[in-house]
Structure formats: C-alpha cells, structure tokens
Swiss-Prot record:
The keyword Transit peptide does not apply. It comes from the Eukaryota. Belongs to the DEFL family. Protease inhibitor I18 (RTI/MTI-2) subfamily. Disulfide bonds join 3-47, 14-36, 20-41, 24-43. PROSITE patterns: GAMMA_THIONIN (PS00940). The keyword Disulfide bond applies. One of its GO terms (biological process) is defense response to fungus. InterPro entries: Defensin_plant, Scorpion_toxin-like, Scorpion_toxin-like_sf. This is Defensin-like protein 1. Keywords: Antimicrobial, Disulfide bond, Fungicide, Plant defense.
Amino acid sequence: RVCMGKSQHHSFPCISDRLCSNECVKEEGGWTAGYCHLRYCRCQKAC
C-alpha cells in the first residue's frame, strides 16, 4: 500500500522499502520512522 512520509526536505509517497531507500539516497540519508536519517532506510509502515 502507499504510505506518505516526510524526508528532511519534502514529502513523497513510499510504496516499498526499495523505493524509499532509492529516494532517500538522493537526500544523502535513509528512510527511518518517516524521516531520512543516516544510511538506514525503512519505509514508514503506518499510513
């Protein structure tokens, strides 16, 4: 399912851990708990 979350700079839809990871790499961070932090990427599970 599609969940919405926020990176450090903007909001974008997350569909899978892979997509979240790819998007956050562009932000020089990782997707974690709805935010980009360090290099760890996890899609926000709750919508």
